[in-house]
């Protein structure tokens, strides 16, 4: 069979469509509205969608301009309306089938309600969690990156604390000023998060992120010291540990600190974190987008938080917050995220298949792998804590896991024999392998190992490849490595 070559014109058209060089800027605001709607709908665990929900525009609720052939509902988006080849989320895609074009997705998009923008999403009270109503336009904020959202959340709380200090100074006769409250980093986080939080405030770094860290936090609080906030990843990167959010919430109500969750690794499809947080941050670059052609971040305010009114005013100040998500990025982020629920569910299934059928038999003494880090494998404590906040309907354990090895040579050989894309991101539609510790903490290896992040740790982010293909790739890498 002679392979058909693309013409230069076709290649140019594909690149322009794929990387957003032919977009109409006029639709950027509409794209941002849809992104916020999408986040607001899933940031609260909600079992059922309204019967009248539609993918993009709901007839009868839009003006005439919405019915014109725009980028947001043009033929380019028809690629997102395809069905799985086998009719199911967890089924495998025939990798030999000729693709229709560069924009085709084999996974159907999730329904997104397109009624009025001001309509709020709600969830009924369940298992002791308070009902929440999140307004997309008032409570969801977009950023050019996930780290920008975390930095802004931290700066917001530092500003809150500075007002407390000013009130204390103005109302006190003593000459000494009250100290700034410290920030607690709970668990071993993404490297940039650690450096940002430590660089802009005094911190307690409780890197274990388990029951021992909770006891240490409780000891600090009972000593009489007030803390500003606890930052926690759900779960942590790269050890996939999960702290006890219910206990953190109880302590926050008792001692008056705030909780900021970074749910990038778990994702809003899998984790119902907002009821236990004052602010939820996320990188939209990862699973929410998936296509690896756009960067973005989000921040969601909990309307029931003590800091909500202050945070809402803070985010309206031009000197404090500006929506810097580039217009073309917003349009492509909207397109990419239409099927993020279906992609997340598929990745959940593929990851558990890969772990159960291929990797777990090779874990243990005198075997290739020393340990697998994954929310249902890291520890019983992590599994219990994760399941307490896992979304009821679609929630799984995510597509990220880490492997450690008994032998450094085996780690290198396995990585070399793993015929996958290699890179530092996660949540992409294609599977990625990354020697996390060496690449991220090369100059701080001893510090990382102190918290269980071994230098030979290999992090895997599972994509949308079929289970059979992934299984074959990993099995071949295992077979070649054990021959050494």
Language-model region placement:
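Conserved C-terminal alpha-helix-loop-beta "cap" of PLP-dependent enzymes
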Residues: 1, 173, 178-181, 359, ...
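PLP-dependent enzyme catalytic core of the Aspartate aminotransferase-like
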Residues: 1-78, 82-84, 91-92, 96, ...
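Conserved PLP-enzyme active-site core in the AAT-like
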Residues: 59-61, 68-73, 126-368, 373, ...
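Hydrophobic side chains in well-ordered alpha-helices
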Residues: 310, 410-414, 470-474
């Amino acid at each position: 069979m002679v392979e058909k070559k693309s013409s230069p014109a076709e290649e140019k058209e594909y690149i322009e469509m794929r990387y957003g060089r032919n977009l109409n800027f006029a639709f950027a605001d509409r794209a941002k509205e849809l992104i916020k709607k999408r986040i607001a709908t899933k940031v609260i665990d909600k079992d059922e969608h309204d019967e009248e929900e539609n993918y993009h525009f709901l007839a009868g609720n839009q003006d005439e301009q919405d019915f014109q052939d725009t980028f947001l509902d043009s033929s380019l988006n028809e690629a997102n309306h395809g069905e799985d080849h086998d009719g199911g989320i967890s089924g495998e895609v025939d990798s030999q089938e000729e693709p229709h074009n560069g924009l085709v997705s084999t996974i159907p998009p999730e329904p997104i309600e397109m009624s009025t923008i001001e309509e709020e999403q709600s969830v009924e009270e369940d298992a002791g969690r308070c009902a929440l109503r999140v307004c997309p336009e008032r409570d969801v904020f977009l950023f050019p990156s996930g780290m920008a959202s975390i930095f802004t959340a931290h700066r917001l709380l530092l500003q809150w604390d500075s007002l407390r200090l000013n009130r204390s100074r103005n109302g006190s006769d003593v000459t000494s000023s009250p100290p700034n409250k410290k920030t607690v980093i709970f668990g071993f986080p993404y490297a940039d998060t650690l450096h940002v939080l430590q660089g802009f405030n005094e911190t307690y770094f409780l890197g274990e992120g388990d029951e021992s860290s909770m006891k240490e936090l409780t000891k600090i609080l009972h000593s009489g010291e007030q803390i500003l906030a606890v930052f926690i990843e759900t779960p942590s990167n790269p050890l996939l540990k999960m702290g006890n959010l219910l206990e953190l919430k109880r302590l926050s109500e008792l001692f008056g600190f705030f909780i900021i969750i970074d749910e990038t690794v778990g994702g809003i499809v899998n984790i119902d974190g907002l009821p236990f947080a004052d602010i939820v941050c996320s990188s939209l670059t990862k699973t929410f987008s998936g296509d690896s052609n756009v960067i973005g971040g989000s921040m969601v305010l909990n309307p029931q938080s003590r800091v909500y009114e202050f945070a809402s005013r803070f985010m309206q100040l031009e000197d404090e917050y500006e929506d810097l998500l580039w217009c073309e990025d917003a349009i492509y982020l909207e397109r990419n995220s239409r099927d993020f629920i279906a992609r997340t569910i598929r990745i959940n299934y593929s990851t558990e298949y890969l772990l159960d059928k291929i990797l777990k038999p090779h874990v243990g003494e005198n075997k290739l792998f020393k340990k697998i880090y994954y929310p249902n494998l890291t520890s019983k404590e992590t599994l219990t804590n994760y399941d307490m906040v896992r979304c009821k309907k679609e929630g799984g354990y995510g597509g990220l896991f880490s492997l450690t090895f008994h032998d450094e040579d085996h780690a290198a050989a396995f990585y070399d024999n793993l015929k996958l894309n290699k890179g530092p991101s996660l949540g992409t539609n294609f599977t990625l392998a990354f020697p996390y510790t060496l690449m991220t903490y090369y100059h701080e290896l001893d510090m990382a190992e102190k918290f269980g992040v071994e230098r030979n740790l290999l992090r895997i982010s599972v994509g949308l490849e079929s289970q059979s293909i992934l299984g074959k790739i990993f099995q071949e890498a295992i077979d070649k490595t054990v021959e050494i």
